[in-house]
Each structure stands twice: as structure tokens, then as C-alpha cells.
Regions:
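Adenine-nucleotide phosphate-binding core of ATP-dependent small-molecule kinases
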Residues: 265, 272-276, 283-318
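Phosphate/pyrophosphate-binding loops at sites that engage ATP/ADP/AMP, CoA/4′-phosphopantetheine
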Residues: 69-84, 190-197, 312-323
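Glycine-rich phosphate-binding loop of actin/hexokinase-like ATP-binding domains
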Residues: 150-255
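Glycine-rich beta-strand-to-loop/alpha-helix junction loops that act as flexible
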Residues: 9, 89-92, 208-210, 322, ...
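N-terminal glycine/serine-rich phosphate-binding loop of ATP-dependent small-molecule kinases
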Residues: 1-95
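Internal helix-turn-beta structural module
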Residues: 298, 302-322, 326, 332-401
């Protein structure tokens, strides 16, 4: 069964074609800068990485270009569109409407659109991908896999905000959490890797990259997570502020006469590592600047790492302990110094990092704690596309995802 996995952003489409029975990636790549004059497609072909300029005006055009590439004589891996059995979509926000992946139909589409209000930056472009497939491959079944679904097992005490209750009852204002597909994958995979059952295990999954979130997973279920109504809450991120006093935002809005749109832009695109360091949102560039003595770069790294440590400690307390800590995401998988600095203050909980194993690990599955550590600390590369493909396969075959 060949499953095309799509992740549509505002000006991009990432794709992966997976032969799911054999767990084999047939093709992967992405189109960027949709609607701009310098739009391009990049993809892997054998051991080569290829980039080509394209004239692409919208997501329909982008998906047509992807399908043309998949069936081209020069770079294709399939002969005909009919070899695509299903399409799995990453959908960012499912609100309280979806607690698992679903077959996309008119009713599901209507519910995705109902979430536009709480996910204005993400759901409309996810929907554009669904619409594009409906236009280009109308006979192919589609499945929606929601970032928020894994977190629907959180109890009310974890997801409610201490605001007047009517805003939850009438407007759905609550914590939803994100990166759920990644947290679900790594929390399951780490148990397979260690040869243990999820039942009875307390796991903290740290998805740390340009965006970042942490989830408390107990008995295989999410019971709390750091992101909130939107992906802005929680950790300090590349350009997102994470946790901040709402009073500080109101103060700035009043003093500088900022609109809600201005503030949305500030907390999402001008803050975080980039905002504090003044260097970049790229961890590699900030680390290089810090090594050269840039004080704001040093401060931004210290803030970034401290906030991860705080959430790990808080979630360990919430669960009454922790058995496994997992690092994933671009920084979590590849930045050994971040992992070490996050875990160092956790020694009081019995966390002991094996410095040699940690330094040697650059994105491979592996244990980076010592044999004597009371808590297993493990690096697990995330694979959201695989998870989306597996859910799609299950639904197409009539099984529970």
C-alpha cells in the first residue's frame, strides 16, 4: 500500500510517499515559497539532493507538481497516480472534535473549518491540501491526522485555564497541545526500543526544535503538555516567546499602541531565541555566537535550556516520578550540549547522563544515561510521517488507528 503523506504550510508543502507494508520511503521532498516568483521543489533522488525552480501559484499547483515529479520518467518512483492508495494529511488543530485520526469526508471538513478561529495560521492551509487532493485525485481516500488528538486524554485540571468558565463553555478556550503525532510516536517507540510496556510507565517526551513542546505520558496517554490553545505557550522557541505574563503583553500593547495582530506577530515571529539573542532563531548560529562571547546569545541559551528543565521537573512531580525522558526534534536529536545542560540540574531525581554516549549521539536511537541512572534518558528521532502513514493504513483497512 502506497501512502502519500502531506504537510501543508502557508507557503510550503512537504511530502513523503511511503510503501507502508514494507516500511519503505519511495520519495520525499517539498515545495517552498508557493505564490512567490522564486518558488522551488527540492527532493531526494537516490543519494542526490535536487532543487528545481518552479512557477507555482497555489497549493493545487504545488500538489500537481509533486504528483508530476512522482510519475516523471527522470525522477519518478511510480508509473501512474493510481499507484497512490491513500493520502494522509497532517492537520494541526482538531479542537475537542477529534481524539483520533479519521477518514476525511464532508462532515470532517466542516469540523476542520470550525477550528479556523483557534488555528487561523494552520488549519486553512491544511485544508488547502485536502481541497487540492480532492481536485487532483478525487477518487483517492484521504485521512486527517491531528496534532491535538493525542492530548485529548488530558484531564480537565490539566487543560483548563483559570479564566471565567464561560470562555471555555462558549468559545473552547483551553489547552489543546500540539506536536501530538510526534509525542505519540516517540513515547511508543521508546518503549519498543527499551523492551518495556507503556502500561505503568511514566514518560516525559521533549520535542525540542525551532518549535518545542514537552508532554507527560502516563500509561501511554498524554496527561499534560506545555503548549496551549495555540503553539505559542510553553517553552521558549526559535521565534515564539513561550510562557510570559499576559500583563506584560497588555502593558506593551497600551504603551506602544499595538494591535492584536501586531502582538500576534511579536510573540510568534519576533521573540524566543531570535528575539533575546538578536542573532538568529537557528541554534547553531546562536551557539557559535555564544562561544565567541556574545552575552545575549549566552543568555538566550541559558533561558532556553532552563525552561525545558523546569517543565521536565514539573511533569515529573505531576506524575509522581519519571521512568524515561525522551529527546526528539531537531535540537533534541542533534544538540548534545542542550541535552546535557537540561539534564544536569535533574541529578536530584536520579538522572545521570553518560557524557561520552551523549556527545557521540547525533540523532540516532540510543540511551544517553548511565547504567546506574534511576531514569532512562533516550534519544529517539521522531517520524511523524510514518505515524501518519500507519494511521492512514489502519483507517483504510477498517482498523482503529
Amino acid at each position: 500500500m502506497n501512502i502519500l503523506v502531506l504537510n501543508c504550510g502557508s507557503s510550503s508543502v512537504k511530502y513523503k510517499l511511503i510503501e507502508i507494508k514494507a516500511n519503505k520511503v519511495l520519495a520525499e521532498g517539498g515545495i517552498e515559497k508557493i505564490g512567490l516568483p522564486d518558488a522551488f521543489i527540492k527532493f531526494k533522488f537516490g543519494n542526490e539532493k535536487i532543487q528545481q525552480d518552479l512557477d507555482i501559484n497555489d497549493h493545487v499547483g504545488a500538489i500537481k507538481s509533486i504528483l508530476d515529479n512522482l510519475t516523471s520518467k527522470e525522477y519518478g518512483c511510480i508509473k501512474d497516480f493510481k499507484e497512490i492508495d491513500a493520502v494522509g494529511h497532517r492537520v494541526v488543530h482538531g479542537g475537542e472534535k477529534f481524539n483520533k485520526s479519521v477518514l476525511i469526508n464532508d462532515e470532517v471538513i466542516a469540523k476542520i473549518k470550525e477550528c479556523y478561529g483557534i488555528a487561523p495560521l494552520h488549519n486553512p492551509v491544511n485544508m488547502a491540501g485536502i481541497d487540492a487532493i480532492n481536485e487532483v485525485l478525487p477518487e483517492v481516500p484521504q485521512v486527517g491526522v491531528f496534532d491535538t488528538a493525542f492530548h485529548q486524554t488530558m484531564p480537565a485540571k490539566s487543560y483548563m485555564y483559570a479564566l471565567p468558565y464561560k470562555y471555555y463553555a462558549e468559545d473552547g478556550v483551553r489547552r489543546y497541545g500540539f506536536h501530538g503525532t510526534s509525542h505519540r510516536y516517540v513515547s511508543q517507540r521508546v518503549c519498543e526500543f527499551l523492551g518495556v510496556e507503556p502500561k505503568g510507565k511514566k514518560i516525559i517526551t521533549c520535542h525540542v526544535g525551532n518549535g518545542g513542546s514537552i508532554t507527560a505520558v502516563k500509561d501511554g496517554k498524554s496527561i499534560d503538555t506545555s503548549m496551549g490553545l495555540t503553539p505559542t505557550e510553553g517553552l521558549m522557541m526559535g521565534t515564539r516567546c513561550g510562557d510570559v505574563d499576559p500583563g506584560a503583553l497588555i502593558f506593551l500593547m497600551d504603551k506602544y499602541n499595538l494591535s492584536s495582530k501586531d502582538m500576534l506577530n511579536m510573540v510568534n515571529k519576533e521573540s524566543g531565541l531570535a528575539g533575546v539573542s538578536g542573532v538568529s532563531s537557528d541554534m547553531r548560529e546562536i551557539t557559535a555566537a555564544a562561544k565567541q562571547g556574545n552575552e545575549k546569545a549566552i543568555l538566550s541559551l541559558e533561558m532556553y535550556e532552563q525552561r525545558i528543565t523546569k517543565y521536565v521537573g514539573a511533569f515529573a512531580a505531576e506524575m509522581g516520578g519519571v521512568d524515561i525522558i525522551v529527546f526528539t526534534g531537531g535540537v533534541g536529536e542533534h544538540q548534545s550540549s542542550t541535552r546535557a545542560n537540561v539534564c544536569r540540574p535533574l541529578r536530584f531525581m536520579g538522572v545521570e547522563i553518560d557524557d561520552a554516549a551523549n556527545d557521540a549521539n547525533n540523532g540516532d536511537e540510543g540511551i544517553i544515561s548511565t547504567p546506574n541512572s534511576a531514569v532512562k534518558v533516550v534519544v529517539i528521532p521522531t517520524d511523524e510521517e510514518y505515524m501518519i502513514a500507519k494511521d492512514t493504513e489502519a483507517i483504510i483497512e477498517g482498523r482503529e488507528p
